[in-house]
């Protein structure tokens, strides 16, 4: 619903034919957030396209190196008055054979739909989630917390980032859902499950998720990437 879109997502294929999807939700005044998210996605994507990487271990090493390079690049830009407060969340997901490997910074999310359930794979790097994990807030209090949008890590911070990495084995019939917090602030995991498993095209599923979140009163940008796992490979 926001007029300026600070979210950005794109898909890239490297020389070994391996796909990576990268999603970012930028922050910062004026256009700083738009620039940060587009820059992080594009810089990482351009670097990925040039690799021959073909194993999850190589992807993990690649993530660890390139995410910090991008963190420093955006941090340096953010020191300029025009880009004050510039930063971005980042979700990057590569699919290698029957495995997905991902890197996570911030409060965008990656989820897996398998069988009857939506599983959130990532844990938000947010103040509210830290308080929740420490037992200082109940899930209900966390939902309605006024500082819900404060994140504890982002690409563009001064300190070295500590990304979360994960690997998930994929099965036919799985869906991977990547989204900015504009979606999950507005609709529940069970609603995401119902829409993604409904009998409509993949594009329509993504569009329906966004529409539902907007109808629920979504005030933020909402960006979604959906991956459907078939018998042979990912679509």
Report residues per predicted region.
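PP2C/PPM-type serine/threonine phosphatase catalytic domain
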Residues: 1-235
